[in-house]
């Protein structure tokens, strides 16, 4: 079957040892130089290998006991709840469109059942086998990314942006209201890892705290509270302050 196209929302009309990570400055240097981008140049692309490498760093190796997981995922005493809905704009070798990174393979059925049943979950060609990355929709996703991000151009001028999609209702029903802030702790840790990975790759990231969650859900057909969009992030070539 042919891949579907990205539709605009109705809005205002693992095994990380299998990855070869790039050589980079020391962790201390990256942490000290880490900044949030205020705008992107709308033209910088990143290599698919760099993209896969970044995604590899956010994989928590959920199949392992907590203390055997790669840093920093060994600090979270629960199974990963958040997965990434990726708006890919400028990644060399990847077709622009929407993708999903499933951070815990056991949650793939939950995600598939929570989204439009007509979506085709196509494993990404050339992606490491240990990275559960799926291509959902083909097409220019820049306008959709900008619209759902409160019309912020940073979501479309980047190399890619993403929404952090969390298993929601089931977690809260099973664990109680205390689960809600913990979902954001996990989202925050994801954001910090992405910030440092962007710096290591010679680009820059920034969080997107303003977004329209219902239109995000609409793009992939999320119709209930089983999963919810909690936070957004974007990475690309920064425009430096003068």
What are these regions (language model features)?
Residues 1-242:
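Acidic, surface-exposed loops and disordered segments
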């Amino acid at each position: 079957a042919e891949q579907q196209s990205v539709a605009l929302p109705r809005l205002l009309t693992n095994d990380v040892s299998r990855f070869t990570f790039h050589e980079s400055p020391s962790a201390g240097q990256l942490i000290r130089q880490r900044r949030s981008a205020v705008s992107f140049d709308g033209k910088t692309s990143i290599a698919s290998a760099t993209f896969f490498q970044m995604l590899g760093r956010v994989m928590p190796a959920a199949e392992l006991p907590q203390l055997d997981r790669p840093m920093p995922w060994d600090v979270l005493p629960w199974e990963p709840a958040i997965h990434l809905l990726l708006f890919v704009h400028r990644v060399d070798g990847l077709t622009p469109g929407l993708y999903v990174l499933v951070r815990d393979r056991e949650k793939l059925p939950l995600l598939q059942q929570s989204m439009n049943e007509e979506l085709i979950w196509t494993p990404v060609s050339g992606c490491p086998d240990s990275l559960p990355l799926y291509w959902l929709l083909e097409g220019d996703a820049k306008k959709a990314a900008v619209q759902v991000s409160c019309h912020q151009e940073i979501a479309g001028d980047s190399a890619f942006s993403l929404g952090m999609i969390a298993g929601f209702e089931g977690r809260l029903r099973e664990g109680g209201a205390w689960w809600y802030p913990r979902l954001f702790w996990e989202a925050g840790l994801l954001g910090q890892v992405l910030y440092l990975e962007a710096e290591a790759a010679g680009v820059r990231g920034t969080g997107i705290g303003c977004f329209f969650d219902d239109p995000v859900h609409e793009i992939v057909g999320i119709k209930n509270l089983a999963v919810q969009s909690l936070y957004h992030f974007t990475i690309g070539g920064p425009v430096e302050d003068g």
